[in-house]
Design a protein with these regions (language model features):
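Rossmann-like S-adenosyl-L-methionine
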Residues: 4-115
Length: 115
């Protein structure tokens, strides 16, 4: 996925973005060590959602916005509640029916720092 993201950025003249693909728990810890503070963090965890360590690292990175892509409404609700307690509010929720004629739905949530 990151290869397509990078190509899309080049095609659109975007030079101030870095794309990192990998396990969020590992990547967030590495970014913290490098003292990286992204403007936007995009997470697309497995069905089990984000673990506590990953949420801790994500919040410590202090992004202005978090885009959370989820295939499980229950873990999405759980993680959004935790992120809300940690200073992020839900701005937009968009369900995406990627699998018509099934009960499965992807949901994209935009969260922003609460001021």
């Amino acid at each position: 996925m990151c290869i397509r993201d990078r190509r899309n950025a080049v095609r659109n003249g975007i030079a101030n973005a870095e794309f990192i693909c990998g396990d969020a728990g590992v990547c967030t810890a590495q970014l913290l060590e490098r003292r990286i503070q992204p403007d936007v963090a995009i997470v697309d965890p497995p069905r089990k959602g984000l673990d506590g360590t990953t949420i801790d690292s994500l919040v410590k990175m202090n992004p202005e916005r978090i885009v959370y892509v989820s295939c499980d409404p229950a873990t999405l609700a759980r993680d959004c509640a935790v992120l809300n307690e940690r200073g992020y509010g839900v701005e937009v929720v968009q369900p995406v029916d990627m699998f018509p004629q099934t009960t499965h739905v992807e949901t994209v949530v935009l969260m922003s720092k609460v001021r």
